[in-house]
Amino acid sequence: MSIFPQMRYFSCIFLLLFTLTICERVKSGNQLLTPLPQDPLIQVYFNNSESSEYRETYRQKTRLGDDLETQIVDTIAQAKSTVDIAVQELRLPKIAQILAQKQKEGVKIRLILESNYSRPWSSFTSAEIAKLGKREQERYQDFQKFVDINQDHQITSEEISQLDALLIVKNAQIPLIDDTADGSKGSNLMHHKFVVVDHRFVIITSANFTLSDTSGDFTNPSSLGNNNNLLKIDSPELATLLTQEFNIMWGDGVGGKQDSKFGLQKPPRQPKTITLGNSKITVHFSPISPTQPWNLSSNGLIDQTLSTSTKTVDLALFVFSDQQLANTLENLHDQEVQIRALIEPQFAYRPYSEALDMMGFSLSDNCKYEVDNRPWKNPISTVGVPILPQGDLLHHKFAVIDHQTVITGSHNWSEAANHGNDEILIVIENPTIANHFQREFNRLYSKIKTGLPANIQSKIDAEVKQCPQIQKPSSSTISTPTKINLNIATQAELETLPGVGKKLAQKIIIARQQQKFTSLEDVGKIPGISDKTLAKWEGIIIW
């Protein structure tokens, strides 16, 4: 695909100027693995694949991997009528540029973002930047260095207008909403990462549209990007399912009624299964209310899929904190299914991490184990964390089952994803697809640290010494009120109500602090609570 003139011009600037500064030119000496066959209707890509290489646009270095940004750009570039994108964060200029170009050509573009990431970096004031957390301030500093094309430490409006992705989107007047479009302060997390083009072509990925999730942190030469996967699927039937999810969130769009639905405001739907060529595909959208049966949730679908295993289960997960899934894996292990697991290091050893269970350990938090915690009686030694370049993360959310079936998408294996976030989970039964994910798992598993780190063992020992008795809470003994008093309920209790996430629960608490509720009319005055929501609460709330 030919990039339009503006992008060619700035690519040249990158090529000429960055060579003299922080750019790292690396001659291709990579030993590539033989590429695996791709399914004609479902292509699989990994940003750290060892069977391909590409030259980065921004840092101008040749490296191993698939260029995920280019895959997204090329898919959008073929659009003739429509492009719908729902993604947590969009910071990649080439994607913004192609969206602007396609809109000029008359293609209908719609974009949904997470409200925490829906502003151009360049729009932040000094006071706002000062209030950002450490990680976000570091990201802002990376952005400043990224847009300073000539590296003169003087950022111009021209530089910003070409490289601040959301400013490009804004200047192109591309229709954009976020999860505050329902009148709330935002849902739990709009965590989707999908694209639908011309009601036919679909991208589903674990990657946000950022440098760190695709090619790597701009100012860190050793960074190769958080490890992610991307699926390109040619299926009008699948595109229809994703468009339905998109339309629920979109409502009537920009500046219209506050009829968008996010999080638990969305109607619950059952998983949908389609046949596409040689593949059987099942799709489910999160979240689901914790008052609904767990087996109907996305984690429930994961559980059902894991339970089919008779040979092997390999996991590569950013977060793993769902106890019931760990219990299912233990049952499979007891049936001699071989299980291997890789967990992102920053989450692998938290008190809620199921990696600890799989290794046979428990770590309490303030003298209390997680609810229903169950360390394995026959622990395994095939649980570990990958050794990655400094700053890079294991951002995958996939499992490979019996070399036949793949579970992937944006959905982390956690309660937050299951009961709070807007997510997509996709299960694909096709050995050709599974082979790609198996190769990716094997690559990551070839460089790992297994076992319990000494500092975590010290934490466990310290908790045992400091706590007279460590509580072992059980869901069977935790009382759940049949009716919830809105004037005294805890935030956790409020979040069990249909349609209530963290942010709405907080708004209820703030409202009652100002004036106690005495009627449904009082409750209905809270932004984000509709008549339909109140109808769902009938018989389960009091004041």
Predicted features along the sequence, with ranges:
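Small-residue hinge/turn detector
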Residues: 501-502, 530
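C-terminal motif of bacterial Sec signal peptides marking the signal peptidase cleavage site
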Residues: 21-22
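Acidic-and-aromatic substrate-binding clefts and catalytic sites of carbohydrate-active enzymes
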Residues: 87-94, 318-324
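Acidic, Ser/Thr/Pro/Gly-enriched interdomain connector segments
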Residues: 472-498
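Alpha-helical interaction/regulatory segments in DNA maintenance proteins
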Residues: 509-510, 514, 524-543
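HKD-type phospholipase D/PLD-like phosphodiesterase module
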Residues: 31-79, 89-307, 344-404, 411-426, ...
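Short catalytic-loop micro-motif centered on adjacent basic/acidic residues
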Residues: 83-87, 177-178, 312-317, 341-342
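Long, C-terminal catalytic modules of enzymes
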Residues: 387, 391-396, 401-477
